[in-house]
Amino acid sequence: MQFKKLSVLMPVYNEEIAVAANILETDDYFKKLGIEYEIIVMDDGSKDKTYEKVKELNNPRVMAFKQRINEGKGEALKEAFKKSTGDMVMFLDGDLDIHPRQFEVLFEVMKTKNADVVIGSKRHKDSVLNYPKNRRLMSAVYFFLVKLLFGLPLKDTQTGIKLFKAEVLKNTFHKVLIKRYAFDLELLVLAHHKGYKIAEAPVVVDYKGKFGHIKFKTIFNMVWDTLAVFYRLHIIRYYDKQQ
């Protein structure tokens, strides 16, 4: 399996302290791989100088854009994809809790399993996690809910690194309505519903200790969005409608 160009879509929000270093680290890694690539940084309405820090890099392989207001990671990724030109697309969170070098692991799984989509999975048996206990508990409960509602052949949907053949996103993104909490789930449910093969790969996650307690509002919105996906899939069959 070959590809002509990789588009790395990197959503960021209020990351002015680390964003420049993280982008340079990402650029350096892909430069050493010797592949054709572009890095598209989408600032999701940051209130600090994140966007300015990216622009200051003046790197021809890095394109920077900014949303007028904060609309959510999902919307940022959709807008970034519109700017992309690669036939292979990777989602990569801008905080680099997951290092870009894991692209090689995901791409190898894509080749080996002849998959259309490969997602990093915190629940993969070979994953290495520096991950708060409260987040692990929430992940386990959410996995149970997703399995119950959708029966997806996946153990994780929310990890911030994913690799797609661009055609998958071209055929699914226009149907994705969720902008924030369950965006990843809706995209993967839709891809699976359309018959694309999705595989999982192990990840090394190095959370940097910036997470506090999970807010009740976040949990509520996550569950609400998840039920909305179920409603669109099984009740009104929105994803089957032509658009």
Predicted feature descriptions by range:
Residues 35-45, 65-67:
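Short beta-strand/loop segment that forms part of the nucleotide-sugar
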Residues 30-35, 57-62:
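Short helix-capping segments at alpha-helix termini
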